[in-house]
């Protein structure tokens, strides 16, 4: 007689399972990761921090070119599909290819010893997904136990999954060429069956961001904002959300000793307020130091899981070593951070909405207060820029425009996210600010001390008392002075020897904004927002 869990796996096509390790404890997972017989990417290494380190193989980041969504009655009119005109990661997949991939993965997972983790995605009981993750690999089970919300013992007794992730990282798709796919690896979603299939990639982030993409599909259709942001709350219950692409400071700036962390990456905003999707944090560890990021540094202990870091024979970690990848990471349960919202990662409505950008062009001001129209414009633009070395050693800025500060994870059209966010902001009387954590005319990055001073001024309301003036080209309102912030940096023109040099760079960046925004001007709402963006001199 099959047990209930065996029957449920058999319904998915996974049969003759040797053993099911169902919802193991951290202690059990540690023992599994340390088993002497493990080899390859299954092997865990104990570091002197107490945390286990693993390697994810050739995939040290997500594989967006291998992401597909089944094109069917459920999705055909809702998904923001890729097109020749505007490319994105939502590539359509036929039902027959899906069936084939499902056979490939279920065949791989059958006749094996499996780990099954049941967890929630979403701290709101109304809007959460009950996710079941099935994998052969102990550390992948550990990763999702860290990253998703861990149900209580009572919740586990009655747990009924409404989304299933089948991780077949050890198997690839032999028919990919005939099926017209990008490669033998795949990350595929079926919204009718509510299943995610993974093949060929061991990277843990595919499971985390996969469920984020699904929340990004399901929630805005129910008028719940779905956001790639961090969030925290002050002593008075005042909530702030921080949007921003990778490397702009979301995790660093929302981890604030004066405020409690709601979450560091993915949130929803419904009629009750802001809630975290996750039960853990997935922090970058490149160049991590206790001095600069004490909370993250101290979170790396037993039960944390390090990815692709270089571990010496004595178990010490060299966080500066990027020989495997720059995208070294650690996942840990959120309670490894002291100052968090407990027991449930949620709070009220956000009063302050902060768009973080790291402008390597040296044009944008360290802070500007946005009008409602500018809020939509800069949200849809999702701008940041990095400095990339060219062959002569000159560092050229490379711009990135990523809709809603998270285009890779958007399943619906970007304007839907902007519309729902602004509705929530208007209902709560929220104010948006653009905060640039990047470079200025001195050639140096704006100091973390000044950026923290700016964030403090936004959060304590002192920015509202500041007099402002308009920055030309972008027509952004810039404060004349803020407490605890170097006044000389507030207007970026003052950081150049010649204001004309700033102006030339501003025209260049403005032209890039204008060109990027053209894709949103196919409807009236988009056309109406053009005036809120930078204006080129005729």
From Swiss-Prot:
Annotated Gene Ontology MF terms? ATP binding; metal ion binding; phosphoenolpyruvate carboxykinase (ATP) activity
Q: Where in the cell is it found?
A: Cytoplasm
Gene Ontology terms describing biological process? gluconeogenesis
Identify the GO cellular component terms for this protein: cytosol
Please indicate which superkingdom the organism of origin belongs to.
Bacteria
**Residues involved in ATP binding:** 209, 228, 244-252, 293, 329, 445-446, 451
The reactions it catalyses are: oxaloacetate + ATP = phosphoenolpyruvate + ADP + CO2
Which parts of the sequence bind Mn(2+)?
209, 228, 265
Keywords, alphabetical: ATP-binding, Cytoplasm, Decarboxylase, Gluconeogenesis, Lyase, Manganese, Metal-binding, Nucleotide-binding
- Reported cofactor(s): Mn(2+)
The pathway to which it is assigned is: Carbohydrate biosynthesis; gluconeogenesis
- SUPFAM superfamilies assigned to the protein according to its UniProt record, in alphabetical order: PEP carboxykinase N-terminal domain, PEP carboxykinase-like
Q: Tell me yes or no: is Nucleotide-binding among this UniProt entry's keywords.
A: yes
Q: Which Pfam families match?
A: PEPCK_ATP
Enzyme type, top EC level? lyase
Cofactor detail note: Binds 1 Mn(2+) ion per subunit.
UniProt binding sites for substrate: 62, 203, 209, 329
Tell me its EC number(s), please. Answer: 4.1.1.49
Give the quaternary structure: Monomer.
Would you identify the family this protein belongs to, as annotated? Belongs to the phosphoenolpyruvate carboxykinase (ATP) family.
User: Main role?
Assistant: Involved in the gluconeogenesis. Catalyzes the conversion of oxaloacetate (OAA) to phosphoenolpyruvate (PEP) through direct phosphoryl transfer between the nucleoside triphosphate and OAA.
Spell out the NCBIfam families in the cross-references.
pckA, PRK09344.1-1, PRK09344.1-2, PRK09344.1-3
Query: Which HAMAP family does the record cross-reference, listed alphabetically?
Result: PEPCK_ATP
- How is this protein named in the record? Phosphoenolpyruvate carboxykinase (ATP)
């Amino acid at each position: 007689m099959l047990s209930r869990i065996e029957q449920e796996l058999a319904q998915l096509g996974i049969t003759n399972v040797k053993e099911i390790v169902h919802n193991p404890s951290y202690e059990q997972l540690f023992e599994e990761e340390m088993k002497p017989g493990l080899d390859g990417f299954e092997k865990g290494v104990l570091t002197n921090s107490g945390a286990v380190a693993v390697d994810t193989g050739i995939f040290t980041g997500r594989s967006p070119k291998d992401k597909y969504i089944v094109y069917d009655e459920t999705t055909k009119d809702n998904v923001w599909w890729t097109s020749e005109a505007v490319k994105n990661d939502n590539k359509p997949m036929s039902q027959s290819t899906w069936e084939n991939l499902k056979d490939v993965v279920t065949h791989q997972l059958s006749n094996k010893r499996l780990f099954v983790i049941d967890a929630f995605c979403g701290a709101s009981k109304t809007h959460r997904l009950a996710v079941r993750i099935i994998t052969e690999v102990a550390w992948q089970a550990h990763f999702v136990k860290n990253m998703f919300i861990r149900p209580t013992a009572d919740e586990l007794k009655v747990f009924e999954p409404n989304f299933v992730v089948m991780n077949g990282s050890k198997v690839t798709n032999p028919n990919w060429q005939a099926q017209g796919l990008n490669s033998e690896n795949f990350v595929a979603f079926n919204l009718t069956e509510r299943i995610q299939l993974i093949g060929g990639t061991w990277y843990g982030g595919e499971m985390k961001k996969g469920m984020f993409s699904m929340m990004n599909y399901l929630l805005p259709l129910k008028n719940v904002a779905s956001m790639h942001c961090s969030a925290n709350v002050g002593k008075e219950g005042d909530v702030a959300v921080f949007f921003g692409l990778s490397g702009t400071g979301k995790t660093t700036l929302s981890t604030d000793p004066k405020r409690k962390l709601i979450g560091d990456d993915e949130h929803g905003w419904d009629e009750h307020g802001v809630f975290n999707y996750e039960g853990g944090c997935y922090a970058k560890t490149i160049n991590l130091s206790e001095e600069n990021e004490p909370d993250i540094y101290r979170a790396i202990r037993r039960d944390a899981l390090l990815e692709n870091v270089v571990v010496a024979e004595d178990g010490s970690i060299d966080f500066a070593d990027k020989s495997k990848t720059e995208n070294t990471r650690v996942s840990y349960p959120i309670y490894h951070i002291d100052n968090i919202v407990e027991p449930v990662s949620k709070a009220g409505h956000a009063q302050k909405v902060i768009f973080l950008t790291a402008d390597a062009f040296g044009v944008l001001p360290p802070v500007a207060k946005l009008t409602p129209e500018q809020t939509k414009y800069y949200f849809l633009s999702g701008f940041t820029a990095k400095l990339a070395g060219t062959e002569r050693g000159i560092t050229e800025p490379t711009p990135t425009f990523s809709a809603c500060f998270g285009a890779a994870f958007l399943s619906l059209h970007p304007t839907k996210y902007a519309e729902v966010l602004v509705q929530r902001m208007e209902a709560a009387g929220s104010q948006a600010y653009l905060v640039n954590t990047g470079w200025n005319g001195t050639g140096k990055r704006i100091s973390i001390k000044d950026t923290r001073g700016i964030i403090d001024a936004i959060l304590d309301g002192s920015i509202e008392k500041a007099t402002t003036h308009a920055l030309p080209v972008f027509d952004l309102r810039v404060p004349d002075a803020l407490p605890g912030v170097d006044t000389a940096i507030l207007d970026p023109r003052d950081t150049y020897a010649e204001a004309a040099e700033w102006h030339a760079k501003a025209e260049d960046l403005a032209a890039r904004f204008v060109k990027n925004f053209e894709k949103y001007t196919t409807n009236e709402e988009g056309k109406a927002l053009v005036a809120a963006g930078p204006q080129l001199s005729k």
